[in-house]
């Protein structure tokens, strides 16, 4: 578990080994920080089904994330499942994540396990 904003996320999981849940919710794409077990979120998103095959690799920013991570094995995904949520509820939660303080290194938020 990892906390981003005021929400608990499962993970982070190494992207190539990640088994996405069949659930609506939020997700964060993350890269490792400079300290052990420190991660920086480089992207937040929401989806009606987190198990959509191209959720991560199909994103137009995927190449940029790989540039930051160096390899897909340094790209991590964390999810916050929101069962029985509406699109509006997921969008509101997503907007809450976007206002997190930015870090000086790579992304919008950082978290430590």
Q: What is the predicted function of each stretch?
A:
Residues 103-111:
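Coupling/hinge elements of helicase-like and P-loop NTPase modules
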Residues 52-72:
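A broadly used, surface-exposed interaction patch
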Residues 1-56, 84-99, 111-113:
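GIY-YIG nuclease catalytic motif and its immediate N-terminal context
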Residues 67-80, 85-104:
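Acidic, metal/cofactor-coordinating or nucleic-acid-engaging core segments within structured domains
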Residues 9, 42, 62-69, 104:
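Generic hydrophobic, helix-prone segments enriched in Leu/Val/Ile
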């Amino acid at each position: 578990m990892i906390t981003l904003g005021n929400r608990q996320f499962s993970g982070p999981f190494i992207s190539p080994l990640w088994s996405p849940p069949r659930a609506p919710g939020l997700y964060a794409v993350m890269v490792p920080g400079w300290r052990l077990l420190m991660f920086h979120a480089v992207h937040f998103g929401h989806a009606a089904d987190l198990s959509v095959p191209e959720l991560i690799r199909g994103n137009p920013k995927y190449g940029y994330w790989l540039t930051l991570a160096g390899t897909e094995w340094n790209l991590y995904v964390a999810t916050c499942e929101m069962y029985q949520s509406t699109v509006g509820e997921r969008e509101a939660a997503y907007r809450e994540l976007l206002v997190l303080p930015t870090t000086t290194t790579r992304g919008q938020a950082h978290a430590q396990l």
